[in-house]
Amino acid sequence: MINKWYVLDLRPGFSMAESMVEHGIDTYLLDWGTPNDEDRYLNWELVIAKLARMVRRVKRHTGADKVALLGYCMGGTLSSIYTSLYPEQVAAFVNLTAPIDFSKGGLLRTLVDEQWFDPYAMTAAGNLPAPQMENGFTSLRPTSKFSKWIMLADKYQREGFVESFNALEQWAGDNIPFPAEAYQTYIHELYQQNLLYKGKHFVGGKRADLGNITCPVLTVVASRDTICPPAAATAMNELVSSEDESVLTISGGHVGAVVGSRAPKQLYPAVAAWLIERFGKDAAPRLRDVNAEADVTAE
């Protein structure tokens, strides 16, 4: 809901969706759409309901009783809430650099501290505009607007670098507005009050208790993530009731870990192996060596 879905299908060879399909995993991506002015009243409950409709549609299309959910960044937070509310619908959950303990949110948490940040004032005129979202993330690393061009000048002769750079630039600049009511809840209840981590977050009158989650859980963290520091994500594993829960650490930042040059060799096969070892035993042996090479630690 902050950037568009295709970061997980960026371009051939640098696509998590493509890799999952190549490993024999039926894969579906949820496009949240682009909010219009009238969507300012799209609240948190309706956002979770949209995710629930997606799950029902995938189940109808595949005939499966349950689905494995993978959520990236805010999508992971939303998916964790959904899984806690409807644990019987989810066979496995992959938290891909998504914050759960927002008190560990680093600079982004400081940026939206309630002492100086009012999400209601920010959205008084309607949806939060896309440029404001982009500027907020840029403020976490102000020099990145310049350093990326220095990097391009330094590496443009490397095979495929310019293509990857342009694809990522296209996606990074393709921001969308954030629905006002959903934004207010996201910032106030999760970032400022940390209600999800405290077990006090309610959706439609139901408490989102992460302790309800008993399915296998994999939390993926990026070692240099400034948007979701590792501790903000690994809190997931502290709260779930799953007997099968692991942490996978990938080198890189919040975006680089997912679409960077190492992602096709590190992230994609490791996540595929984790899923296949649980739901496709016949295919697991040929991937087990890849999983062993990754920094995977069982909790």
List each model region and its residues.
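Alpha/beta-hydrolase-fold enzymes
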Residues: 60, 64, 70, 78-181
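Short beta-strand/loop motif that positions the catalytic acidic residue
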Residues: 213, 219-221, 225
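Alpha/beta-hydrolase active-site loop
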Residues: 39-61
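Catalytic histidine-centered segment of alpha/beta-hydrolase-like enzymes
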Residues: 227, 247, 251-266
